[in-house]
Amino acid sequence: TFVATFLLIIPNVAFANVVKSFRVWPSPDETRVVIDLGSEADYSYFSLSGPDRLVVDMKDTTMQAKLPVTVSDSPVLKLVRKSSPPEKGTYRLVFELKKNVQAELFKLSPTPGGQYGHRLVIDLPHGKKTATTAAKPSKPATTSKDMSTVQRAQEVLIVIDPGHGGEDPGSIGPSRRKYEKDAVLSISRKLAAQLDATPGIKTRMTRTGDYFVNLNRRVAFARENDAHLLISVHADAFTSPQPRGGSVFVLNTRRANTEIARWVENHEKQSELLGGSGNAFVTNTKDRNVNQTLLDLQFSHSQKEGYKLATEILGEMGRVAHLHNTKPINTSLAVLRSPQIPSVLVETGFISNPTEEKLLFQRAHQDKLAQAISKAVVKYLKDNPPEGTVFSPSSKPMVHIVKRGESLSVIANKYGTNSKALMAENKLKSTSLAVGQ
């Protein structure tokens, strides 16, 4: 009997990686494309013109996601499609652009909580920074001897920062369907509306939709807008479902002093990675000692004021919600590190707690939280008025010209005062007003 053994050699066609999905997040400043992968990306890229395109070659990769992807709400990106690869085993992606842009590509590792695996991120800047236009203070009105000596002092500008967004969901509740980014955006919108309705206050939001904003960009946004305060809104989380209640974090350059504070700090670093590279601020190396002294003074002031604001917020939040900490917590989160601007990070509750997860998405509870924070901010401003603002006693009087349909009580309400005070200030003998007075 003759036995023959044959070895069948089959070429290895298994791919090392797979594209699972595409996610596109247009924001006011840039369009972010996130490619979800099975493993770490091995890629190269280049740009083409006539028409403008970005070409990305991914080695040993196959496609599981559906292509093409049409993008309708981005000012720079039209379409993502496949193209003929330069060699076998490489998958070529073509990003059809509306104009020439300088793309930034970087890889992200899986998130600790397992929400996302390996990713390749492509940032396509829009060019003009539409979301970061500085808020210009109102020009003083012409001095007048008319009725309302009510030249306008500067309004207090408050930047509200809804945490996370877009590619970064923040913490995810035990139901696995509720994201921190959505709850805090809703609360932030309500807070902005509450504060904007207060005479002498106006707000700006670091994001107004579901898109990611780099942590350093959030701080820069507050600086560019000459903000008097920065309030970052988040929902807390922990590895067990038991912790519950709100907290307020304030700046401290020392290491976080509780286990939960350390967890939040480490969790935020994952969000910081989503923005690629960059430093919070760079000092002038030629005047290092002077800069250090100035920074120390600025940090000392912003830290002290931030602590005052945090204390007020905790006092009001405690009336409408359970508190996890009744005193401000010291930490060194990036969003709190602006030396010029008193900043606080408000944890509105634990999304990892099943009961609080439900509360954080209830409109009535969101309203209560927004009202509590707003009330605390107004109280802080009255007790600690920023110089040159309408809250400051030393502010120059404002001029108001009476318009048709306005009564003394309407004007008084607009400026947060009462009719009697306006009559005394303007030496009025009657509540009757004339248009143009």
For the regions a language model picked out, list residue spans one by one.
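Structured segments of extracytoplasmic/periplasmic soluble domains
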Residues: 38, 83, 98, 123, ...
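Catalytic-core regions of hydrolytic enzymes
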Residues: 134-284, 299-311, 367, 420-423
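Flexible glycine-/small-residue-rich
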Residues: 37-39, 58-60, 97-99, 123-126, ...
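Buried hydrophobic packing residues in well-ordered domains
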Residues: 35, 56, 95, 122, ...
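Extracellular LysM carbohydrate-binding repeats and other cell-envelope/extracellular binding modules
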Residues: 395-401, 413, 418-437
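Bacterial N-terminal signal peptides
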Residues: 2-11
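Signal-peptide-cleaved, periplasmic/extracellular N-terminal interaction regions immediately downstream
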Residues: 15-158, 179, 401, 407-413, ...
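Active-site-adjacent mobile loop/cap segments within catalytic or ligand-binding domains
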Residues: 43, 56, 178, 285-390, ...
